[in-house]
A protein has these predicted regions:
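Membrane-integrated ABC transporters
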Residues: 1-42, 56, 60-66, 88, ...
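Hydrophobic alpha-helical segments in the permease module
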Residues: 69-81, 172-175, 249-260, 266, ...
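Cytosolic ends of transmembrane helices, especially the final helix of ABC transmembrane type-1 domains
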Residues: 220, 244, 292-322
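Juxtamembrane loop-to-helix connectors within ABC transporter transmembrane domains
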Residues: 47, 106-153
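Transmembrane helices of ABC transporter permease
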Residues: 33-34, 66-77, 81, 142-193, ...
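Transmembrane helix-loop-helix hairpins at lipid-water interfaces of multipass membrane proteins
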Residues: 26-80, 87, 158-164, 279, ...
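ABC ATPase nucleotide-binding domain helical subdomain, centered on the C-loop/LSGGQ "ABC signature"
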Residues: 335-338, 421-461
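An intracellular "coupling" helix at the cytosolic face of ABC transporter transmembrane type-1 domains
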Residues: 21-24, 112-113, 125-137, 141, ...
């Protein structure tokens, strides 16, 4: 991205995507800004009237009347300014609510929901760029747009004072426009690259924080420091390139401010000396244009805020660009857990397999075969070819959420960050005796009783303070409450005592749940049969010895290869 040419059109595209749905707030803020800018001219115009008329009469009544009108106009400015601030605060709340809702939906409906597996977990750090958008938009609407509008109005009014002022204002606008054109593309691209460098550094620090003490050794510490220095150097270098453009613009605007202020005084003085301009007009022009010139001197700061807004909008657009799965809305889920795969191909794996409803098989799987099958059953991936049926029907005809409620895959030790009570309530709203019996069945009753907060213990994403085996047992207890039609258990369940696992499977058997138990210890349990789940061939056996013979033969073939 650092070398990609980005321009104003790209910036408008990102801003439209992020801010566009809430643009009504921005438009209303701009309307208030227009009114405030027009009313703000009351002061210089009042001064001009004071000098040209009131001073000549030397009477207090016109002075009081003029001051009273000015006070009323300024109080109206105060009221409109307060309303504008209130509207922008509403914009911040509305923007936050909408972005949170949309990102949640896009994450839930992601085509590939395993963000951590693809090293994309840091993608959601982009959410914090929302704060920049929240603060930059009101600042630009209230500050920058006010400056621009007051400049337009002020330059228009003073242009009618004298043709020389008109020419002066045209040159001033041309100079401002040239400063914007010359450095805008480099500044926009540099701001986006700088934001990316910031997130790369944050991703690295996040990985250090999640290393669980891995870097607490001399060799690993050296690597961590070198990597930190590398991401720091990358950020500093990127910031230096961006600052080159932004600083050049800032200096250019400051120079315009200096030359324009001096030039106005020189031109105004010359016109007064020639009798072509009144003193009141010069004072009014100075009051109007001095504010314009000061605003020009602040353009560099506001453009920096604009570039940050563009970069943050680009980062947020990455969340909106998460590929979404095609949602198929049926009106039902599978009738039972029967599974049939006929020449189903996915990513180099081929499956031809049939399971009856309620069957439970001890399964020995080749590396990768179990994971691909799980992706197919949960419809996280679609077959490249072949036919897949669950409950006698094509999974594409089901309500996708009903399907994923009825098909459960437990093959990871990670768990949602919630309390144990909240996690169990995802399966059953009432933590009655059934839930307690499920915990007792998997052997967690005593362990949970030993925790200081019991069921209210907060779980980390790794399951801590529970061990890996205990976390998998908790997930199995959840499955006992859900009673899915089809359940695939990964090899991590080898960590559970066989008698606990057998007891849980008996309960599932009573409810008609089809189970594939992938294990590295097929001799520990005796179920309805045995399955060898290969990448290209699947074979069922009635006897353990036959399964072990095939597994040993393939292991010997792999070793010789």
């Amino acid at each position: 991205m650092a070398t990609q040419r980005l321009g104003f059109r790209d910036a408008i595209g990102w801003l439209s995507q992020i801010i566009g749905p809430d643009s009504a707030y921005v438009r209303l803020g701009i309307v208030y800004t227009v009114a405030i800018s027009l009313l703000a001219l009351a002061t210089p115009i009042s001064v001009q009237l004071l000098i040209n008329s009131v001073a000549n009469t030397a009477m207090p009544a016109p002075l009081w009347a003029l001051s009273g009108v000015l006070l009323l106009l300024l109080l109206l400015v105060v009221a409109l300014s307060a309303l504008r601030v209130w509207i922008m605060a509403g914009f911040e709340r509305r923007l936050f609510s909408r972005i949170v809702a949309e990102v949640t939906l896009r994450a839930v409906h992601a085509q590939d929901p395993f963000f951590t597996d693809g090293n994309r977990g840091d993608l959601f750090n982009r959410f914090f760029d929302l704060v920049v958008v929240q603060k930059s938009v009101p600042s630009l609407v209230i500050g920058a747009f006010t400056i621009v509008l007051q400049a337009v109005i002020g330059l228009t009014i003073t242009s009618f004072y004298h043709p020389v002022f008109l020419a002066f204002n045209v040159v001033l606008v041309a100079a401002i426009f040239m400063v914007w054109l010359i450095w805008r593309r480099g500044a926009i691209g540099g701001a986006v690259a700088l934001s990316h460098a910031k997130h790369k550094a944050a991703h690295w620090l996040e990985s250090v924080g999640g290393s669980n003490g891995f870097y607490k050794s001399s060799r690993h510490l050296d690597f961590a420091m070198q990597r930190s220095e590398a991401v720091t150097a990358s950020y500093v270098d990127t910031h230096r390139r961006y600052f080159r453009y932004q600083f050049a613009q800032t200096v250019a605007f400051l120079l315009i401010y200096a030359f324009a202020s001096a030039g106005l005084l020189l031109l105004g003085g010359m016109l007064i000396l020639r009798g072509q301009l009144s003193l009141g007009q010069l004072v009014a022009a100075e009051l109007i244009l001095s504010g314009v010139f000061y605003g020009i001197s602040q353009f560099g700061w506001y453009l920096d805020s604009f570039y940050e807004l563009v970069a943050s909008s680009e980062e947020l657009s990455l969340l909106f660009a998460i590929p979404q799965e095609t949602t198929v809305r049926g009106d039902h889920g599978p009738r039972d857990g029967a599974v049939k795969l006929t020449d189903v191909v996915l990513d180099g794996a081929r499956y031809t397999l049939a399971l009856g409803a309620g069957e439970q098989l001890v399964t020995v799987a080749e590396p990768g075969a179990e994971r691909r099958l799980a992706m197919l059953l949960k419809r996280h991936a679609l077959p490249e070819r072949g036919l897949l049926r669950i409950g006698g029907a094509d999974p594409g005809s089901f309500d996708i959420y009903r399907l994923r409620s009825d098909v459960t895959v437990l093959d990871r030790s990670t768990i949602v960050e919630a309390t144990i009570r909240q996690y169990l309530r995802l399966a059953s709203e009432d933590l009655d005796e059934v839930a307690m019996e499920a915990l007792a069945t998997v052997g967690l009753e005593r362990r949970l009783a030993s925790l200081p907060k019991g069921l209210d213990t907060q779980l980390g994403s790794t399951g801590y303070p529970l061990s890996v085996g205990e976390t998998m047992a908790l997930k199995l207890a959840n499955a006992l409450l859900v009673r899915p039609k089809l359940l695939l258990l990964g090899q991590l369940y080898d960590l559970l005592p066989p008698e606990r696992l057998a007891a849980a499977l008996r309960l599932l058997k009573a409810h008609g749940t089809t189970v594939l138990l992938c294990t590295g210890r097929p001799e520990d349990l005796e179920l309805d049969g045995y399955l060898h789940l290969g990448m290209t061939e699947q074979r069922r056996f009635d006897r353990l010895a036959d399964l072990q013979a095939v597994a040993n033969r393939e292991g010997a073939d792999d070793a010789s290869a």
